[in-house]
Amino acid sequence: MAAAALLLLAAAAAAVVVAMALRWLLLLGGPAAGRLGKRARMPPGSTGLPLIGETLRLISAYKTPNPEPFIDERVARHGGVFTTHVFGERTVFSADPAFNRLLLAAEGRAVHSSYPSSIATLLGARSLLLTRGAAHKRLHSLTLTRLGRPASPPLLAHIDRLVLATMRQWEPAATVRLMDEAKKITFNLTVKQLVSIEPGPWTESLRREYVKLIDGFFSIPFPLAYFLPFTTYGQALKARKKVAGALREVIKKRMEEKAENGGSIGDDEGKKEKKDMVEELLQAEGGSFSEEEMVDFCLSLLVAGYETTSVLMTLAVKFLTETPAALAELKEEHANIRDMKGKNQPLEWSDYKSMPFTQCVINETLRVGNIISGVFRRANTDIHYKDYTIPKGCKIFASFRAVHLNNEHYENARTFNPWRWQINNKLQNAVGANIFTPFGGGPRLCPGYELARVVVSIFLHHLVTRFSWEETEEDRLVFFPTTRTLKGYPINLRLLSESIC
């Protein structure tokens, strides 16, 4: 899913000190070095400095608002597919949309996703992120069943209500860090979808531990960290046990309820209100999922639903604030919807489908922001592309960012321009042409991509129809270890109406 690449990039970066040292020692005399060296037609490029390769150059570039030169300079010298050496090993970078398409489609055959062991330890070996082949297909299908139907009236009602619940906590004139507030919304919504528990002391306690778990993805998991609880990674492991334990208690209770009903979930109204991912798992395949499988699966969905959607919400507001004409048009679109519905009526699917400019804003935020800058894959076999051979075992990075910000595909590509999605018919086929891949593609296409759009649309609707705002201080984007604003995007909010109902 979309968060998979986000976690991979962060964890790989965090582990760079250990990985580079170990990998370098292995490559000095090991068979991998000879195999790579004998391939005359590897994509051209540079391996940079001994031991560290070009890792520091990449990190330095991605810690700025403009990381493009790292890839642009190499594409200019070597072409759209080139070789570098980052995070401890030789890696082929692709800024070629056709090759990226092949990589995404070849998941599970010619390539597979590759993650550090620290990720597996924190998420669990049975998580959606880490499973492969038939096991991944099974979990992906279940996720799509639950998250791929955002038109469901109960789901829309939950989103609408949870967004407003967070906004009610904002005072008539408040200063908030929008990133933090967006994360509260996405966390509470994901918990609701997983286990049907409303925001309260239980969810807040879970969220506090969960934040520690997330911090572990961006830390250095050196060997002693597993045994030292005062390190960031050690604290993340401890938090993982608590989060998994809390989920396990809920799942165990639901399994007991099912057993008491003779293996049936039940059809009474109370049970219908509880319909969530846990019940999907309990009903699937005759209840064949084990308790641990369900815990790992739910934990991985909690991670996937948290970071990327909240960043998308924040960046949409930031880009709109910096583009007054776009903000004015968005406000007009949502004011018209609110006028037709009345002040306090919740949004419905027909309202969501009446937000064409909002979808343009979301597309453009995804394209310019590049919350997922790309995905790593590892070759299962020798891969032949054009005149090059990428050997089995080689790591490959498919850069979505390089394609999204290429002037050959988008006019003035580095300018936020949501109208480009209205007037340029060519872009209507952008997804099919694989020049627009914000949610990945192939078997690992994010199953919750449409739900993410719905959440952001509803959030923007209530924000622009209830508040005005201004930035309290300058905040800039950085892209390492993840896409985010440095300060969480602090803004001053002013309530437009007297109450939020």
From Swiss-Prot:
EC number: 1.14.99.-
The keyword Endoplasmic reticulum appears for this protein: no
Gene3D superfamilies on file: Cytochrome P450
GO MF, any single term: iron ion binding
Pathway in which the depicted protein is active: Plant hormone biosynthesis; brassinosteroid biosynthesis
Keyword Signal: no
Enzyme class per UniProt: oxidoreductase
GO terms for biological process, alphabetical: brassinosteroid biosynthetic process; brassinosteroid homeostasis
Transmembrane segments: 2-22
Subcellular location, record wording: Cell membrane
Expression induction: Down-regulated by brassinolide (BL).
Membrane topology: Single-pass membrane protein
Binding site for heme: 446
Cofactor(s) required, per the database record: heme
Pfam families xrefs: p450
Signal peptide location: none
GO cellular component term of the entry, any: plasma membrane
Job of this protein: Catalyzes the C23-alpha-hydroxylation step in brassinosteroid biosynthesis. Converts 6-deoxocathasterone to 6-deoxoteasterone in the late C6-oxidation pathway and cathasterone to teasterone (TE) in the early C6-oxidation pathway of brassinolide (BL) biosynthesis.
Family (UniProt): Belongs to the cytochrome P450 family.
Protein name: Cytochrome P450 90A4
